[in-house]
Amino acid sequence: GTSGVWPDLQASIDSLKKILSDGKGKESDPTVASSLMGWMFARCDEEVTIGNEWICKDPYVQRDHAEDPLDAFTKPTTNQAFLYFCQMIDYITGPEWAAKVPTHIKIYNIAGDQDPVGQYGRGVYEVTNWLIDTGHDVKTTLYSGYRHEIHNYPDLKTEVVWNLAEFYNNVLGCGFESMMEKYSS
């Protein structure tokens, strides 16, 4: 994950544990999502009508995301699932987590610098630094002006794919060089 330190995470975990201890784990409380993720709309300059505008500025991508039958918009997220999400974020935060990641794995952190999940770039660099400080080989790319779904912006997705292909080629030696030369000219 490239979230860095999630805002008010421990308070969310404590609140969700209380909700679950009250027997409401299978329910979906909309105030939970709002308190956990409501801040993610702070930099959305368009009107928030769907509830996922933070993912991408493109309205088509927003609608496609919201209408996906496997997405939380078509089936509310339970309080228990939110607790598990928060616990997962907590587990993958900090130098202690980074030290557990095998150092032989090459890592490519990519995000938009307007992605709230990556704390608008700060969290992505936090994760990168935790990994570097624990002996990892990390490449990081932030795409200026883009939100969460960098691979879905029509004007950016080709660049994202090429950069991923180049990273994999450098790490795995997959022979992408000739393909990249053919299609990049």
Where are these regions (language model features)?
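Alpha/beta-hydrolase-fold enzymes
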Residues: 1-76
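Alpha/beta-hydrolase-fold catalytic nucleophile elbow
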Residues: 1-3, 110, 144
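Active-site nucleophile elbow and catalytic-triad environment of alpha/beta-hydrolase enzymes
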Residues: 71, 76-99
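Short, conserved loop/helix-junction motifs that constitute active-site signature segments
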Residues: 98-103, 133-134
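Short beta-strand/loop motif that positions the catalytic acidic residue
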Residues: 103, 108-111, 115
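Conserved alpha/beta-hydrolase "acid-adjacent" motif
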Residues: 114-126
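A general structural detector for well-ordered alpha-helical segments in enzyme core domains, enriched
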Residues: 123-130, 160
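Catalytic active-site module of serine/aspartate enzymes centered on a nucleophile-bearing elbow/loop
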Residues: 132-185
